[in-house]
Amino acid sequence: MLAPVLMVVGTASSVGKSTLVSALCRIAARRGIRVAPFKAQNMSNNAAVTANGEEIARSIAVQAAAAKLTPSVQMNPILIKPEGQRRSQIIVQGRPWQTLEAIDYWQRKQLLWEIVTNSLDQLRQAYDLVIAEGAGSPVELNLKAHDITNMRVATYAQAQTLLVGDIDVGGIFAAMLGTLMLLEPEERQLIAGLIVNRFRGDPDLFTDGIQILEQRSNKPVLGVVPWLPQLGLPEEDAVALERPDQTTNNAALTIGVIQLPAIANFDDFDPLAQEQGVAVRYINQPHELQHCQALILPGTKHTLAARQWLTEQGFDQAIQQFQGPIVGICGGYQLLGQQIDDPEAVEGIGGSMAGLGLLPITTIFQRHKQTRQVQALSNLPWAKAYPLAGYEIHMGRTELLADQPAFSIQQAESTHADGCMRANGKVWGCYIHGIFANTEFRQAWLSRLGWQVQSAIQPIDPFERLADHVEACLEPNLLTKLLGQEIRD
């Protein structure tokens, strides 16, 4: 017998679907329900690596953590990583499949439906409940024939489906009622209820709004979820960086992260932003560097295009003259070197470009993609021999022109160098994503910048905080009411 599926779809992108799925996963898990997240297809350059070296969306790995599970590739069988110029790398079952333009992918998309259903069925066989997430809106009519993520999944699984709307951006009635109107009748029947997300103020003032939605939709409003600030969970994609909520006024230390084109895995820097007295500021203009005590060049899906963009924006001289510490992660590490070569046009345009010249390294792109979890030791003078854990996702091979490795990767029978540093450790870079999630290393680097460790405060589990917040706003025993005895004990 296959386990039931609870589906979460939204009126648009960025309405809070991923966060709601995380909340529902933790609510179910702490009741003893063996629950797994699922998203047929995700488009994001924020990726995670499973224990088997497979690449999935970072948001799915977060949902797996909420469900108290180790992430697996079945939870996200298809990942689309935009590279710019209408091209994307398609990851299928955790491995690179093809790099395609959008129209080519649409034409081949239906070939992947069997992979989607096989992955979903495997989860339904292994767990008591699967909570599936849609993508964007389920009623993008010009794209719906090619949609393998939203109501096609719900229909296949006959899933009880929640429709989520973001009231904070306005237009909740048009968004909710319009979405329901545009669904096919058989799809509309699967909608079990509506969730109004990100409500600011007193929810009691929305009583009339609930009545309007219920009367016009013939669907119950199952919850009004208030805005929850500073959640402490990674954002799904770079849309979040456009929100004007970067508060640095009260920070003793501001770290600038250059918002490169096709920025990738920017959740690497969330642990920095969560430290008291530290602000992470995403910057687009060279003059913003004057407000920063340290600078980070993040990962990017298109290193050569990012290098050209830095020159066009006037960053070259500003970076060269920056007096504070400089760090490069993955693509940002490549940018700090002497030369970047792409003879096989792995990134699409090919060619060679000079790097920023701050580290003695050269990089050449290859079609083989390195994806793995790693354990390492730091060689940096202010964090000597600190143990680290993280993961790598890259297609370039970088050679050191001087014997100055920043880290030593520890493997079963050997070690090898990763990253590079200047002798004093002021400028360094590496391929290790998640490096700042290592508390001892993170705080050592911040201390080098003049930051002082704050008094120890027992951290609150963000998943528990989220689950408490959402559960208090939903219909009591929502999962049981929706799924009843279908959830296996």
Curated annotation (Swiss-Prot):
Q: To which protein family does this belong? A: Belongs to the CobB/CobQ family. CobQ subfamily.
Q: Can you name the source organism?
A: Herpetosiphon aurantiacus (strain ATCC 23779 / DSM 785 / 114-95)
Name the encoding gene, please: cobQ
Concerning CDD domains, the annotation shows: CobQ_N, GATase1_CobQ
Protein name, please? Cobyric acid synthase
GO biological process, alphabetically ordered: cobalamin biosynthetic process
Q: Which Pfam families does the UniProt record give?
A: CbiA (PF01656), GATase_3 (PF07685)
Identify which residues the record assigns to the active site. Answer: C330, H433
- Provide the GATase cobBQ-type domain boundaries: 252-441
Report the pathway entry.
Cofactor biosynthesis; adenosylcobalamin biosynthesis
Q: Which GO MF term does the entry hold, naming one?
A: catalytic activity
Q: Which NCBIfam families does the entry link to?
A: cobQ, PRK00784.1
The alphabetized UniProt keywords are: Cobalamin biosynthesis, Glutamine amidotransferase
Give the protein's function: Catalyzes amidations at positions B, D, E, and G on adenosylcobyrinic A,C-diamide. NH(2) groups are provided by glutamine, and one molecule of ATP is hydrogenolyzed for each amidation.
